[in-house]
């Protein structure tokens, strides 16, 4: 990976961390909640550096530091969703970052990956990660995954998946889906 491209994005991530600490001393992202990230004045520079990594580097060469910071930035951009939208156009990056997000504590990144899985032309094994997101302890992550399932699976497949996931008989699942207007 070109060192300058990686370093530019990492510098932007550090800048964001520094801004967060200065603006909200001692508060974690989870403690802040809400839409606090929208006040960050350098989103355009950060977005540009992020896109440069996606377009100019190979996802397989990314190290854990870069992947963690990219997941962090996707999570912080949860109001605009620009980072995740751009990532869907780069399937190799989407796959690596989706796996990294699933293993992280970044619920704001997890729900975005769950929601955008249907839009990414990634491999089926990655699309099947929707089940991991559906079982996530964070209710919003789980709900967004369940909402994305119909776009990923045919109804019969979805019923089987929900049967396994929820331990509920198929007839009850179909009843719930009918009420939710997923099927007639």
List each model region and its residues.
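Accessory, usually C-terminal, subdomains that scaffold auxiliary metal cofactors
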Residues: 165-173
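Amphipathic alpha-helical scaffolding segments comprising HEAT/armadillo-like alpha-solenoid repeats
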Residues: 57-68, 90-103, 122-135, 154-166
């Amino acid at each position: 990976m070109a060192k300058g491209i990686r370093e530019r994005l990492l510098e932007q991530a550090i800048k964001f961390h520094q801004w967060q600490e200065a603006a909200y001393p001692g508060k974690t992202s989870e403690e802040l909640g809400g839409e606090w990230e929208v006040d960050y004045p350098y989103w355009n520079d950060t977005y540009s550096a992020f896109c440069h990594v996606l377009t100019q580097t190979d996802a397989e060469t990314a190290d854990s530091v870069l992947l963690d910071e990219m997941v962090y930035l996707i999570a912080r951009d949860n109001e605009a969703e620009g980072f995740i939208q751009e990532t869907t156009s780069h399937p190799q990056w989407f796959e690596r970052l989706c796996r990294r997000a699933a293993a992280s504590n970044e619920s704001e990144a997890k729900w975005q990956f769950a929601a955008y899985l249907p839009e990414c032309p990634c491999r089926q094994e990655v699309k099947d990660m929707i089940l991991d997101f559906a079982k996530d302890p964070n209710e919003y992550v789980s709900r967004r995954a369940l909402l994305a399932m119909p776009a990923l699976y045919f109804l019969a497949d979805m019923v089987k998946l929900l049967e396994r996931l929820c331990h509920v008989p198929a007839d009850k699942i179909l009843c719930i889906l009918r009420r939710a207007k997923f099927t007639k």
